[in-house]
């Protein structure tokens, strides 16, 4: 990971963070116990370019900015932790690595299992004072997981393969 920030890195991260906010908060579908968005697409690009830690930090910044500008519920720090961990997962699977079907599936599966099926139900149970075994929490989550896992895997592969990383690396003044 390149620890030194430069103008290119800051501007690219800012652009990707803005896209995450728009895809998550404006174009995303959100109900009380479920959220569907395509904010993972700019996270993939950020992960490929900047690695796990910077992607996690960018996801946290996007979450906080999105919450400040387009709050749909009370702020809960657990979801910000989800954003950081999700960004780190993308960075782990895609930083300086070729995007394959296997990586796309494993990354999506890891995010689905850890974020959607472990952490988010805990946060929802805490926020809404529901038992962790409640179908109010698990019903929509299982349906979303079953529907979004293949969609997200396919889009992750397509986006990951479409990004001309070698061109981006040549144009930048630092190595990714």
Where are these regions (language model features)?
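Loop-helix junctions at membrane interfaces
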Residues: 1-176
């Amino acid at each position: 990971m390149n620890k030194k920030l430069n103008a290119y890195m800051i501007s690219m991260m800012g652009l990707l963070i803005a896209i995450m906010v728009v895809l998550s908060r404006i174009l995303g579908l959100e109900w009380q116990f479920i959220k569907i968005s395509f904010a993972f697409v700019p996270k993939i690009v950020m992960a490929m370019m900047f690695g796990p830690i910077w992607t996690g930090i960018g996801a946290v910044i996007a979450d906080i900015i999105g919450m400040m500008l387009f709050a749909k519920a009370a702020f809960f720090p657990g979801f910000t932790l989800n954003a950081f961990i999700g960004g780190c997962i993308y960075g782990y699977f895609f930083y300086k690595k070729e995007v394959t079907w296997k990586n796309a599936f494993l990354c999506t599966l890891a995010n689905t299992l850890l974020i959607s099926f472990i952490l988010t139900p805990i946060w929802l149970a805490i926020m809404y004072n529901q038992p962790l075994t409640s179908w109010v929490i698990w019903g929509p989550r299982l349906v979303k997981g079953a529907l979004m896992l293949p969609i997200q895997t396919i889009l992750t592969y397509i986006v990951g393969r479409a990004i001309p990383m070698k061109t981006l690396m040549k144009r930048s003044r630092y190595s990714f």
